[in-house]
Amino acid sequence: IYVRPTKDELLYCGEFRELGQPDKKCRCDGKPCTVGRCKFARGDADDKCTSA
């Protein structure tokens, strides 16, 4: 389930965030993104975390 993020979340996660992930963080390649943000921010299997 994807929802529009708040402004702060937009800066962290990009366009979308995924409910159910720790701290509502994006999921990159099946793992929550804890550093920087997801490149695509949609939980895609080929998504990658970018640097902060």
UniProtKB/Swiss-Prot annotation:
<dbReference type="GO" id="GO:0005576">
    <property type="term" value="C:extracellular region"/>
</dbReference>
<protein>
    <recommendedName>
        <fullName>Ornatin-C</fullName>
    </recommendedName>
</protein>
<comment type="function">
    <text>Potent inhibitor of fibrinogen interaction with platelet receptors expressed on glycoprotein IIb-IIIa complex. May prevent blood from clotting during either feeding and/or storage of ingested blood.</text>
</comment>
<dbReference type="GO" id="GO:0007155">
    <property type="term" value="P:cell adhesion"/>
</dbReference>
<dbReference type="Pfam" id="PF02088">
    <property type="entry name" value="Ornatin"/>
</dbReference>
<dbReference type="GO" id="GO:0030193">
    <property type="term" value="P:regulation of blood coagulation"/>
</dbReference>
<dbReference type="InterPro" id="IPR002463">
    <property type="entry name" value="Ornatin"/>
</dbReference>
<feature type="short sequence motif" description="Cell attachment site">
    <location>
        <begin position="42"/>
        <end position="44"/>
    </location>
</feature>
<comment type="similarity">
    <text>Belongs to the ornatin family.</text>
</comment>
<keyword id="KW-0130">Cell adhesion</keyword>
<keyword id="KW-0964">Secreted</keyword>
